[in-house]
């Protein structure tokens, strides 16, 4: 009997030894986790990339209100946004007087518009009101107001001051002939008249404000801040002239009778709500 028990104990010991040999020694949990990490290769620590100081849609020239909901009701500490940058001295870009919209004639404009090189004066980009009634045209180059030469925007304003209280003045211009070939200009004089209150004098303006980082839409003319303030708020945005209001609601009777207040542009329901 004792020999049978002894044989049974020895058999159990052999079985346990075989099982342990196949599975290997049981390691602590921490050691097993560490060995798995080593086997899987080194794990890089997370890299904290710097976040942009201002969102892409935010304008650095305008104050950015912190979001009180962020961070459990406390706003994150950030630097103050950039204020508008307005140089004390800016180049004059254009002038307006009695319906004239003019700008300085430059070598760049002469090349673009095919004028003879070396001309000086104020080039009219648009004429309305008294300027149009006097016979001036877009493209005319003002070179003299009465007896005062005009060579740049400042002299344009100064010359207009000399006739500010008068009701008429002689405007001498160079007008380009649009025939093909080498550019040819002819000099002519028109009389600018204002029936009431005098002619007044020209008002000068600078170039419009631009956003920081705006791409340059023209050739290089020096530093942007020679002509432009940088920021936002000096121009009405969006431009109302670029906004299209939705067409009004029309009745089914108008559609049935083909009452069109405009030329045919397609089916009425393409643009209008019909009731």
Curated annotation (Swiss-Prot):
| Record GO terms (molecular function) | metal ion binding; oxidoreductase activity
Enzyme Commission number(s): 1.-.-.-
Region (PDZ), start-end ranges: 89-206
Lumenal topological domain residue ranges: 21-275
Q: Which domain of life is it from?
A: Bacteria
Q: Which UniProt keywords apply?
A: Biomineralization, Cell inner membrane, Cell membrane, Heme, Iron, Membrane, Metal-binding, Oxidoreductase, Transmembrane, Transmembrane helix
Instruction: Please list the residue ranges that the record places on the Cytoplasmic side of the membrane.
Output: 1-6
Q: Which residues bind heme 2?
A: 268, 271-272
Membrane topology value: Single-pass membrane protein
Q: Provide the transmembrane region boundaries.
A: 7-20
Q: Where is the signal peptide?
A: none
GO terms for CC?
plasma membrane
Q: How is it modified after translation?
A: Subject to proteolytic cleavage which requires both MamE and MamO.
Where does the record say this protein resides? Cell inner membrane
- Per the record, the major location class is membrane
- Short motif MCR 2, span: 250-274
The record's cofactor note says: Binds 2 heme groups via the 2 magnetochrome (MCR) motifs.
Domain commentary:
The dimer forms a pocket of about 8 X 15 Angstroms, lined with acidic residues, which may bind 2 Fe(2+) ions.
Q: Which family does it belong to?
A: Belongs to the magnetosome MamP family.
Family annotation (NCBIfam families): MamP
The record's note on quaternary structure and interaction partners says: Homodimer.
Q: What else is known?
A: This bacteria makes up to 20 cubo-octahedral magnetosomes of about 45 nm in diameter which contain membrane-bound crystals of magnetite (Fe(3)O(4)). Expression of just the minimal mamAB gene cluster (amb0961 to amb0978), including this gene, is sufficient to form a minimal magnetosome chain with small magnetite particles.
Protein name, entry field: Multi-heme protein MamP
In its UniProt entry, the species of origin is given as: Paramagnetospirillum magneticum (strain ATCC 700264 / AMB-1)
Q: What is the lineage of its organism?
A: Bacteria, Pseudomonadati, Pseudomonadota, Alphaproteobacteria, Rhodospirillales
- State the gene name recorded for this protein: mamP
């Amino acid at each position: 009997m004792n020999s049978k028990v002894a044989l049974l104990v020895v058999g159990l010991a052999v079985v346990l030894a075989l099982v342990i040999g196949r599975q290997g020694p049981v390691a602590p949990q921490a050691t097993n986790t560490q060995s798995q990490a080593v086997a899987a290769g080194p794990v890089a620590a997370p890299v904290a990339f710097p976040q942009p100081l201002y969102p892409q849609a935010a304008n650095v020239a305008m104050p950015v209100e912190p979001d009180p909901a962020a961070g459990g009701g406390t706003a994150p500490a950030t630097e103050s946004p950039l204020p508008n940058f307005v140089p004390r001295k800016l180049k004059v870009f254009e002038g307006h007087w009695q319906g004239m919209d003019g700008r300085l004639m430059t070598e760049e404009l002469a090349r673009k518009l095919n004028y003879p090189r070396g001309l000086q004066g104020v080039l009219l980009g648009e004429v309305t009101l008294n300027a149009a009634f006097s016979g001036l045209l877009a493209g005319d180059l003002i070179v003299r107001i009465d007896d005062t030469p005009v060579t740049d925007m400042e002299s344009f304003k100064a010359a207009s001051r000399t006739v500010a209280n008068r009701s008429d003045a002689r405007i001498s211009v160079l007008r380009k002939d649009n025939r093909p070939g080498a550019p040819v200009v002819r000099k002519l004089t028109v009389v600018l008249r204002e029936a009431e209150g005098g002619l007044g004098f020209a008002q000068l303006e600078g170039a419009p404000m631009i956003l920081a980082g705006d791409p340059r839409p023209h050739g290089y003319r020096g530093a942007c801040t020679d002509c432009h303030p940088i920021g936002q708020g000096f121009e009405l945005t969006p431009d109302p002239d670029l906004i299209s209001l939705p067409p009004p609601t029309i009745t089914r009777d108008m559609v049935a009778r083909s009452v069109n207040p405009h030329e045919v542009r397609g089916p009425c329901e393409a643009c209008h709500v019909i009731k």
